[in-house]
Amino acid sequence: MRSQIQSFLKTFEVRYPIIQAPMAGASTLELAATVTRLGGIGSIPMGSLSEKCDAIETQLENFDELVGDSGRIVNLNFFAHKEPRSGRADVNEEWLKKYDKIYGKAGIEFDKKELKLLYPSFRSIVDPQHPTVRLLKNLKPKIVSFHFGLPHEAVIESLQASDIKIFVTVTNLQEFQQAYESKLDGVVLQGWEAGGHRGNFKANDVEDGQLKTLDLVSTIVDYIDSASISNPPFIIAAGGIHDDESIKELLQFNIAAVQLGTVWLPSSQATISPEHLKMFQSPKSDTMMTAAISGRNLRTISTPFLRDLHQSSPLASIPDYPLPYDSFKSLANDAKQSGKGPQYSAFLAGSNYHKSWKDTRSTEEIFSILVQDL
């Protein structure tokens, strides 16, 4: 495969092949704007906003102000998951009973009667004239990306017609082939090491090959070469990348760029808790992958509560994403409000989080360390 870096830099008008991962719940506009100002591509998580046009527009206007430029070198990231299945009311009810017991054991009052749908899915948008699609075409961010699957074909084509590049997260060769057949502009190859939610098209795939980032990149590049694909989408590597050496190792495959998330979490421009920050500064625990928190596999730093929740939650007993996230987020918040501390929280991070603390909370200094030899 021919090197994609120069084409990537020219297409997106950036100095470095660096994308900041969206990281819903931890990232901020300030973080995204700083990465863009420094010559990379900042990302704004939009998972909860696909039906909220005013909020999308406000976020992007505020981003422009922080960057001091209206070029909109930014990645707006949406979720394209399958909506929760109908006919699982009994599973949802048993999950609420499970949380009633957890609350009782913690000494906190439980009053939740149903699981709320925290995140709409962009997949439900099928009309290119939908207000959100029309707004995005007007706003013209450089990239609109999707996690958990592909949006509707007509929506992809409509956005691309306005010169917006469409990216999607993939975790294996089959998903890459789907993305290629859908004529996407870029694919984020998410390795098993990545923190946060696993981007599988199929939720909690029991046949997930769990390919590490290096192996996934090698697999896809080999496929591109063997299939004689002359104009592949931009290939972005993600997962476990924590320093300039790990970046250079992946760029040797001639891919376009890398996407980093966990390395930014200790920054003062991320919104992690003091307890989460301490885990970076003095790492003691491994990470774990579990679907019991949100309904989809995600990687978090392991804690006794999270291990117990995972071990006591067979996949068949877990409601569909994102329903369990409602009960989990409520518990984490209620525990803090009740003075129980952070023991019922999640601490999302990649498997190399213990290598991610750079002895600084400055985004600028972290960025400088990452690109020093690129």
From Swiss-Prot:
Keywords: Flavoprotein, FMN, Monooxygenase, Oxidoreductase. Binds 1 FMN per subunit. The keyword rRNA processing does not apply. It catalyses: ethylnitronate + O2 = chemical entity + acetaldehyde + nitrite + H(+). InterPro entries: Aldolase_TIM, NMO. FMN binds at P22, M23, A24, A238, G239, G240, G261, T262. Its EC number is 1.13.12.16. Catalyzes the oxidation of alkyl nitronates to produce the corresponding carbonyl compounds and nitrites. Belongs to the nitronate monooxygenase family. NMO class I subfamily. This is Nitronate monooxygenase. It comes from Cyberlindnera mrakii. The lineage of its organism: Eukaryota, Fungi, Dikarya, Ascomycota, Saccharomycotina.
